[in-house]
Amino acid sequence: MGKYFGTDGVRGEANLELTPELAFKLGRFGGYVLSQHETEAPKVFVGRDTRISGEMLESALVAGLLSVGIHVYKLGVLATPAVAYLVETEGASAGVMISASHNPALDNGIKFFGGDGFKLDDEKEAEIEALLDAEEDTLPRPSAEGLGILVDYPEGLRKYEGYLVSTGTPLDGMKVALDTANGAASTSARQIFADLGAQLTVIGETPDGLNINLNVGSTHPEALQEMVKESGSAIGLAFDGDSDRLIAVDENGDIVDGDKIMYIIGKYLSEKGQLAQNTIVTTVMSNLGFHKALNREGINKAVTAVGDRYVVEEMRKSGYNLGGEQSGHVILMDYNTTGDGQLSAVQLTKIMKETGKSLSELAAEVTIYPQKLVNIRVENAMKEKAMEVPAIKAIIEKMEEEMAGNGRILVRPSGTEPLLRVMAEAPTTEEVDYYVDTITDVVRAEIGID
């Protein structure tokens, strides 16, 4: 991570950390870096979610892009993966999404996609950061016909909706409950599932600029769980603020998380011979029950660090076509270059229709082990060295011996905060509590600063 770019673009509290001034510079410098090798006038797509700060930042960002001669196609409110899809399929130089995903309304972010539809690599981000930190702005300042042109492009959203519908199957009156998180999916999810023939109940579809992710969406699925039961829906589908995640709810109101969604889609593709190298890419946070279910089905797995960018890197490097995270980021590389909650939802309902199975039946094949995660505040300098402390190393080894292969312990530093994360999984909550509490007691005694 750099000075400005984190694991998912530039983020911060809007108008305080992520200011219009910074947005202008990101547009100007980012647009230049991503289009300097173009032979024709560069074209960049810009989308945003429903945050009150979105239009402010969009105006500044667009001004920066136009100032270096880039033609900007303004997409309005739509999902992050829609920007990636349109960049790749319509030959744009780049795409930019203004969103802070599942964060509250006071935050916002700016995320770039290259001309291939993928998020920027570290080298491109470093080029942009170098320009941001330069003492003087020496980039070209064209005038008159050299300036960029601004185009409103609402057709982009319709094209994305049509594409997702084309990947699904008719749902013939299936009762579907949607929670669009008062976010980006509020402009598209209803239309997509109506076009597929579903009978819909929708919540979280009245954005006011301040209520994005507020007690709704994939991080707060409780309202959707109740709605599914009340409406008798076959499935509930909860997206986050920019709709790159999906958490599902079965007909009984039970959560079906990213691990289970990946398993269901992965098994379906594997049985059809369409799962590349018969492998799913996942992260170290995926549940042990998910791993055991894959082993039972003979499906391979590749494990990465936490973060969808690392999942995508591994998929691209090794040619895999399915990967994701427990949090609901699911990447279906045959269809799009990034996590796409609405695409995952369309595929999940297609599998239900084709197999004739309920979501609870499909999800029951994965027995999720109870999991507990505790964050311990430590000095930044110590979080990377925790495993070198003899007492900590010894207690982890002792707990792993007691588990005897029927559980899992993961101790890792936070990538952004002075925290050490201690996680355990085991067959019962009592065992999980015992393992985590025993380890955290030792960690706190040795290096904790609480």
Curated annotation (Swiss-Prot):
Family annotation (InterPro entries): A-D-PHexomutase_a/b/a-I (IPR005844), A-D-PHexomutase_a/b/a-I/II/III (IPR016055), A-D-PHexomutase_a/b/a-II (IPR005845), A-D-PHexomutase_a/b/a-III (IPR005846), A-D-PHexomutase_C (IPR005843), A-D-PHexomutase_C_sf (IPR036900), A-D-PHexomutase_CS (IPR016066), Alpha-D-phosphohexomutase_SF (IPR005841)
Keyword set, alphabetical order: Isomerase, Magnesium, Metal-binding, Phosphoprotein
Active site residues of this protein: 101 (phosphoserine intermediate)
Annotated gene: glmM
EC code: 5.4.2.10
Family: Belongs to the phosphohexose mutase family.
Necessary cofactors: Mg(2+)
The species this protein was found in: Streptococcus pneumoniae (strain ATCC 700669 / Spain 23F-1)
GO cellular component, one term: cytosol
CDD domains from the UniProt entry: GlmM (cd05802)
GO annotation, biological process: carbohydrate metabolic process; peptidoglycan biosynthetic process; UDP-N-acetylglucosamine biosynthetic process
HAMAP family attached to this UniProt entry: GlmM_B
Protein name, entry field: Phosphoglucosamine mutase
MF-aspect GO terms: magnesium ion binding; phosphoglucosamine mutase activity; phosphomannomutase activity
Residues with the Phosphoserine modification: 101
Modification after translation, per record: Activated by phosphorylation.
Binding site for Mg(2+): 101, 240, 242, 244
Domain of life of the source: Bacteria
Function text: Catalyzes the conversion of glucosamine-6-phosphate to glucosamine-1-phosphate.
Source species taxonomy: Bacteria, Bacillati, Bacillota, Bacilli, Lactobacillales
Keyword Phosphoprotein: yes
Recorded catalytic activity of this chain's protein: alpha-D-glucosamine 1-phosphate = D-glucosamine 6-phosphate
Note on how the cofactor is bound: Binds 1 Mg(2+) ion per subunit.
